[in-house]
A protein has these predicted regions:
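Active-site-proximal loop and beta-strand segments within enzyme catalytic domains
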Residues: 44, 48, 52-80, 86-88, ...
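Active-site-proximal alpha-helical segments within enzyme catalytic domains
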Residues: 117, 215-222, 282-303, 357-373
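Active-site SXXK
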Residues: 96, 110-135, 161, 219-223, ...
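N-terminal leader/targeting segments and the immediately adjacent pre-domain N-terminus
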Residues: 2-105, 112, 128-133, 163, ...
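Structured C-terminal helix/loop/strand segments within mature extracytoplasmic catalytic/sensor domains
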Residues: 29-32, 348-393
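Active-site helix/loop module of the DD-peptidase/beta-lactamase fold
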Residues: 129-169, 225-281, 286
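Active-site Gly/Thr loop motif
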Residues: 259-278, 319-369
Length: 393
């Protein structure tokens, strides 16, 4: 299947996140919402300046939809589907209870690089199942023949891929890793070191940090071969559906990103490898409420009933700073020095996607915050306002 589409009535369960402020009176619910009014109005005033129709020409004051336009030709084109987006929306949970929501929080929109963190969670599922017992083992040891066999790539470990220090070299479904060399992103505090797309000299794996979507897609391919099952199926059935989510969820690949696996039953299957974002189209479409469910599940320890789906040690490791990039963990942004995300605590972590997608786990307030389609230039103002509201709640 090119993607998974789940349309079903949601079942209530003990694990489903509450959709009301405190399951109390309307007056109390309104009081909860009023606490966050300033932050919500601020977010809604600063929608990302992208057209809502990804195929439409930008209006005055807007920029083209997506990030592929900044790539050198011929890589500056979409390779997978994109779809209409909604407006600014979001959800706030505190202690597992929804205390604020705005916009269309049940609308499933593409979330760009928030999907990277979902790949780290899938690697955690593989670890819990014994498929990935040692993240410091070279990837080629378990999945040979898919691009890790060269002299340079054979020393790359799973940990290198998860922290974006792999320096993997090659082409993944027609995209060369060079297209994202010298890439800079908004939350990387370092100055640009070169021109995006230039053939930067490679370093030893583990010694150089670079935000590179082709290498993330190579991690996704490796996880596909490790599970021997399409990653959207694993994510949906293992993580999202047990939380009561999944309506409208889909995880789509590029039009030509098909490969053959032998599944657990020994049957050959032609399946689609999915990207860890929407840089060239495809990727995860998911609602703000489902993103909040996932973040709250992470914050509270990664269990579903009696099953430890992802170990607490794995989740803690995701939030540990990379030795050479302390602003980053395992496909997660960090705030250990307090400067990358002013207003958030130094223990906070963020999943971030282009187009203004932020999923913020805030241990200091036992909270998770999701905002979609916020102009990233105004993310600091939003974070500061939400932090102030949480401190009063």
């Amino acid at each position: 299947m090119a993607c998974l589409r789940i349309w079903r009535n949601r079942k209530r369960s003990a694990l489903r996140m509450a959709h009301h402020c405190c399951d109390v009176s309307p007056a109390r619910h309104n009081a909860c919402m009023n606490t966050f009014t300033d932050a919500i109005q601020f977010a809604q005033s600063y929608e990302v300046p992208w057209p809502r129709d990804p195929h439409a020409a930008p209006l005055p004051g807007q920029v083209p939809f997506g990030v592929h336009h900044g790539d050198p030709a011929p890589w500056n084109v979409l390779r997978g589907p994109v779809h209409m987006r909604g407006g600014v929306s979001g959800v706030v949970l505190q202690r597992g209870v929804e205390v604020a929501a705005w916009g269309a929080p049940d609308r499933a929109d593409q979330t760009f690089s928030v999907a990277k963190t979902y790949l780290a969670l899938l690697a955690g599922v593989a670890n819990a199942r014994g498929l990935l017992p040692d993240v410091d083992e070279p990837v080629v040891a378990r999945v040979p023949g898919i691009g890790f066999d060269s002299a340079h790539n054979q020393s790359i470990t799973w940990a290198h891929l998860l922290e974006q220090t792999s320096e993997w070299e090659g082409t993944c479904f027609g995209l060369p890793d060079t297209v994202d060399r010298y890439r800079t992103v908004s939350h990387d505090p370092r100055p640009p070191a070169g021109v995006k797309g230039d053939a930067r000299p490679l370093q030893t794996p583990g010694t150089y940090w670079e935000y590179n979507d082709v290498r993330i897609n190579q991690l996704s391919l490796a996880l596909l071969h490790l599970f021997r099952q399409p990653l959207p199926e694993v994510f949906l059935h293992t993580i999202l559906q047990p939380l009561g989510g999944g309506e409208g969820f889909r995880w789509e690949g590029y039009d030509d990103a098909w490969t053959e696996i032998v599944d657990a039953s020994g049957t050959k299957r032609r399946v689609q490898s999915v990207p860890g974002g929407t840089h060239w189209g495809g990727g995860v479409s998911i609602s703000a409420r489902d993103q909040a469910r996932i973040a709250e599940w992470m914050r509270s320890g990664g269990r579903h009933r009696d099953e430890q789906v992802v170990s607490t040690q794995w989740l803690a490791r995701m939030a540990e700073p990379c030795a050479i990039a302390p602003f980053y963990g395992w496909l997660t942004w960090l705030n250990r020095d307090g400067r990358n995300f002013p207003g958030a605590s130094t223990q906070a972590s963020f999943m971030i996607g282009a187009g203004g997608h932020y999923v913020w786990i805030e241990p200091a307030h036992e909270a998770v915050v999701v905002v979609r389609w916020l102009d990233s230039a105004h993310a600091p103002g939003f974070i500061e306002r939400i932090a102030a509201a949480l401190s009063k709640h």
